[in-house]
Amino acid sequence: MNKEWLEKINMTLEERANLEKWCENIGYKRYESICNSIIEKTKRKSVNYSVLKVIAKYDFCLSDFLHSMLKFIELRFRSYLDNNYGELLITRQEFLYQISNKLTNGKRGLDCSTYYDKKLKDETTLGEFLTASSMETLLRVLFLLPKKELEVFNKNIAQLKEELTKIKNARNYVAHGQVLLFNEKFNLKEMIVLMLKYMPTKESKLKRIDELDKLNKCLFEEECKLPNILRESVAIVLKKKEFEEIGL
């Protein structure tokens, strides 16, 4: 394994031992990626251990932050389907085709029987099925609902489908422990704003924003004062237009 990048970090022997221990637990590639991105941003040949440590910690914390919101959003849509359609009986054979017939009065059929969780009984309810299903299957069922009903979540149905698909895809980055900061393929701030938009209440949105503000203050003011160029490119700070987009 290539460890040459470790030589780019200004650190003591004790700090190096700590860093290698974290790398063993979390993965060298993740730390190496963050280290190289910091050097690229600052246009310097090395990075201080304290800076690498706090930015890596921020990346991990944001991963947990997104994961928490993902679970909340998923629960919101599962609860809606469960409360309104949870008692619908379905069988193992062509289960989703049956769901689509029942939810659309036979107007649309969608056969995805391969998604059926074999742990479920041959006959089950939609509520039990959704509990055992992935978010992908949850959205397949949700998008069968009439447009009028989906307007509860967003007046623009095409936008709702596009945004929830983005949120579903974001799970892959979070679940597989990929670096979120400095990632050109993953617009972290855009994704946080999008998830906040689907928090169910004003209070839940404000609570998450407060958590983000406290995290920024704790890491970048109290734990390690970052150079401005780094702080501006790393810290997620919401502005007026984003508050409006979230609905605040």
Q: Predicted regions span which residues?
A:
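Histidine-centered active-site/metal-ligand motif
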Residues: 176
